[in-house]
Amino acid sequence: MAARRRPAAGVGARDALAVLALALCTPGVGGGALEWYSAMVSIEYVDPQSNLTVWSVSESGRFGESSLREERQGLVGVPRAPAPAEGCAPDTRFVAPGALGNAPWVALVARGGCTFKDKVLAAARRNASAVVVYNLESNGNATEPMSHAGTGNIVVIMISYPKGREIFDLVQKGIPVKMRIEIGTRHMQEFISGQSVVFVAIAFITMMIISLAWLIFYYIQRFLYTGSQFGSQNHRKETKKVIGQLPLHTVKHGEKGIDVDAENCAVCIENFKVKDVIRILPCKHIFHRICIDPWLLDHRTCPMCKLDVIKALGYWGDPEDTQELPTPEAAPGRVSVGNLSVTSQDEERSESNLPSSSSSESGPHRPCLKEDAGEDTALLGAGRSEPQHGGSIC
């Protein structure tokens, strides 16, 4: 009987994950990417105490979302006191130490108090060529995106609080500070749009439905497989019982029925030896018991003539399909297995019950081959026959 293959686990889940991965990798599904540029900020001023020029440069700025990405330079101007450092008022006036006439200058204001747009417009009214916003103190050295749509063609960047406050204090002391703004590194920041979230949610739900359907199918297959295995185990148990009813015989030393030098087992291809236990099949072929029993459990047929042993014994199929054990063609009162004759116990009883006159008339007769009392022997299909006068029953 061909073995049923157990359903492989994990195939449906892998297919569902592949569908989800394909959905996420489709062009345009990822939502989009935020592009922004860092700014190189360099400052230069003369230290009044040492009369030395101090110069520093760092990539510490970030261009605003609506800012022009161009280079700008000029003296730094801050809101004139007592105006707040945020520079939110439309009429805010700026002071830039060292500025001459219409020379370009850069407005430096603090974050907070109003929108970025209001700060940029207030500085643009004073003809600032660029606006620098320094971040809040709580944010430390970080910079953040700035939204200032509608401010026109003006350069707007954000710098960190420590850097901005350092420049602001220098300007308030009346020290001219020259600032140069240059384009830094281009950055791409991925983000997922709302449409992409919906698409991923649909893909995930689809994956869950596929996985659930596969799990249902898998467990149905597993249930059927377990049931078939349970049936096969019961099948083997019944087959073992039937095989156990086949007659056994122990080979004896000097036994005329078996030539130990010529006879061999067709399963293991070895000669029969004294004290070997052999199994006798309905087809009269004999084999080692330890060889033929496992064979019959798997094949049910004689290795030599292919007779279905189980059916031949009448223990297989529906009751109406049950076959009777065929009567082997042998002499009445014995079953011939090769050269081996196994005498029926019923015939022995018949011999013992014969009248004395029959014995006297028959004359001396040869002793019959009898099995040991402990051996399991059987007459397979042989009909009972009446003893005849003048002959010996063997």
Curated annotation (Swiss-Prot):
GO aspect biological process, one term: negative regulation of MAPK cascade
Signal sequence, renumbered to the chain: 1-31
Biased composition (Low complexity): 352-362
Residues bearing carbohydrate: 51, 141, 339
Keyword annotations: Glycoprotein, Membrane, Metal-binding, Phosphoprotein, Signal, Transferase, Transmembrane, Transmembrane helix, Ubl conjugation pathway, Zinc, Zinc-finger
ZnF (RING-type) residues: 265-306
Modified residues (Phosphothreonine): 327
Modified-residue entries (Phosphoserine), positions: 341, 344
Membrane-spanning intervals of the chain: 197-217
Annotated pathway: Protein modification; protein ubiquitination
EC number: 2.3.2.27
CDD domains linked: PA_GRAIL_like, RING-H2_RNF149
GO molecular-function terms, A-Z: ubiquitin protein ligase activity; zinc ion binding
Cellular component GO terms, alphabetical: membrane
Membrane-related topology note: Single-pass membrane protein
Pfam family, one: PA
Domain PA: 66-171
Region (Disordered): 321-394
Reactions accelerated catalytically: S-ubiquitinyl-[E2 ubiquitin-conjugating enzyme]-L-cysteine + [acceptor protein]-L-lysine = [E2 ubiquitin-conjugating enzyme]-L-cysteine + N(6)-ubiquitinyl-[acceptor protein]-L-lysine
Cell compartment(s), UniProt: Membrane
Protein task: E3 ubiquitin-protein ligase. Ubiquitinates BRAF, inducing its proteasomal degradation.
Domains as described in the record: The RING-type zinc finger domain mediates binding to an E2 ubiquitin-conjugating enzyme.
Protein name, as recorded: E3 ubiquitin-protein ligase RNF149
Origin organism lineage: Eukaryota, Metazoa, Chordata, Craniata, Vertebrata
